[in-house]
């Protein structure tokens, strides 16, 4: 078993693509554990980190845990932000929640949340 492998605990998320949004709250330190737990239940995990989240935990650590793409900045092609079965944002800072409620889209995470809302995909914060 490699250090990136996870012990499978169930298949409730098998075939599901979960977007994990990470903001700058101190609970961002739990991102590694959460990403690995999602994978233990079969999920494919893609992560979007806000700049403030990157001050708390490194994208390298999150990439290791998720074994998926980690988006940290704007990219010319954001079309992939709508290919998720659900979005989980943790920690969800008051700033992010307020921005989402008011329809702001000033970053990749808010763009993905807007796309998920438009599709009717589950959003958990």
Locate the predicted segments by residue.
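A cross-family phosphate/adenosyl-ligand binding-site feature
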Residues: 1-125
